[in-house]
Amino acid sequence: MKESVISSFDYLKSMTSFDPKTPQYMVNFLKKSEHYCIGVIDIVNSSEISSLLTTKELEKYYGSFLNIMAKIVDQNRGFVIKNIGDCLLFYFPNFAETQTNDKFINCLNCGLKMTEIHSEINQYFKEIELPPINYRISADYGEVSIMKTNFSPNIDLFGTPVNRCVKINHLAKQNSMIIGRDMYRIVKKNADFAYEKIGNYAVNTRFAYPVYSVRKYSNII
């Protein structure tokens, strides 16, 4: 019995060893974690919209939206991690509170540009006979683990900032941007942006995580 348990343990341990040449899907976490800013943009009522469109129309609808948003991320020096259905996950690397906050500003500018282009996207969709689109943007900052697979050169990110960013997204109003407390603490003194606390995300029964809306200050004066 003991030999059987040891054998099973060794077998399971061998299955966890990363082999980049194996034909099986495997993951490997880099030894060093990083502090990144994470962003998410998610379409509102996508299930209802999907039910009204053909497969070809859906491909054009989501493909156009995701490509436009990915381009905005790139223009602001961010990187797309992946899309999860109609949701786009992206990040801005090499953040640290001891460094200048230029890349935090890039993240804010990226999200706000996404909100500003809303009417233009809907005008384009109208011209190609697709329904209007609405979406929400959320961002936060913190320590993440970096994962790679043997099937792709691209990275994936895991950690509390990623989870929180996805969880708080629904608190944003349509076609607006929100940020979590950890990012707010770093950018709140920047005079180019205006912030307003809009509520809390209940992490558990004891802890509520504050969430803030973001706007360009020039747009409210």
Where are these regions (language model features)?
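Catalytic core of nucleotidyl cyclases, primarily class III adenylyl/guanylyl cyclases
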Residues: 77-103, 121-160
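Catalytic/regulatory signature loops of cyclic-dinucleotide turnover enzymes
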Residues: 140, 160-185
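Catalytic NTP-binding/metal-coordinating core of nucleotidyl cyclase/transferase enzymes
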Residues: 25-106
